Amino acid sequence: MTRLTLALDVMGGDFGPSVTVPAALQALNSNSQLTLLLVGNPDAITPLLAKADFEQRSRLQIIPAQSVIASDARPSQAIRASRGSSMRMTLELVKEGRAQACVSAGNTGALMGLAKLLLKPLEGIERPALVTVLPHQQKGKTVVLDLGANVDCDSTMLVQFAIMGSVLAEEVVEIPNPRVALLNIGEEEVKGLDSIRDASAVLKTIPSINYIGYLEANELLTGKTDVLVCDGFTGNVTLKTMEGVVRMFLSLLKSQGEGKKRSWWLLLLKRWLQKSLTRRFSHLNPDQYNGACLLGLRGTVIKSHGAANQRAFAVAIEQAVQAVQRQVPQRIAARLESVYPAGFELLDGGKSGTLR
């Protein structure tokens, strides 16, 4: 594997450097070819590097930043006042070619806006989408987008998301001829918003997309599709609901039920079941799939969950490594060119799309 350099916004997220810096060291331990640029306040970063050995320090560089974009800041205001912030400087390192990708757990709206401003969308893409790869009950994986970058999406954007998701499924998840579905309130053709029905009509006309129709939310983890496309509002609510249910389920498995008198054999049986079920469903733990790629840009940007712990942020770093190694932006650009050889034209005020 060739050497690669990532830029980390270590000040972002709910816990800042106390999580991101140890996660960076963990990532260095796992990948001997990795170099990390830690962007943030040196006074907050340096003490957390006390346990780093000489070899790790040789692959670390602190890039001082003057400020941090607050997680509750309005994106428009945050972008206007972003110069010198850890988030903006992290993206600028990618733009300048000093880093091949970046990772941030900061303000999602600000990250989306700054990434679009600095790195620019690929030709043929209106707006980037947040995408993640979720495990399903068949022990496979499903690519899901958009997860919150775009609250409102017209049919053109949904079609573009489908193309990008299909490329990601093939190139990163290594699923040949991935099945693509639109998230909807029913499987019938007449169900759903106009934007969803119009996107469905366009997807049926694209030979390179293995479009299978609509999928309902209760089938998200069944493995019935390899790529699931939706608008950012729906995707964000769906993902967080699923994560909450999974965390509650795993928490219940670990509960010991203190204060309840039970026979020794019932306690033994319970502990055996806890260990067995925890192992069986551990792949659904949200920490293991943290890191949503901001897909559709000319560079690689990974958005970590703001509440990520050390393990989860390290997973987000690994997501960035994989995206760089698989050359995801370049492959999406190539697919768009093959699907839309003469460009993409919006019709009906953006309510539908067609090839020309």
Swiss-Prot record:
Catalyzed reactions per annotation: a fatty acyl-[ACP] + phosphate = an acyl phosphate + holo-[ACP]
NCBIfam families (alphabetical): plsX
Compartments where located: Cytoplasm
Protein name (record): Phosphate acyltransferase
Major location category of this protein: cytoplasm
One CC-aspect GO term: cytoplasm
Signal peptide start and end residues: none
Upper lineage: Bacteria, Pseudomonadati, Pseudomonadota, Gammaproteobacteria, Enterobacterales
UniProt keyword Cytoplasm, yes or no: yes
Pfam family, one: FA_synthesis
MF terms in GO: phosphate:acyl-[acyl carrier protein] acyltransferase activity
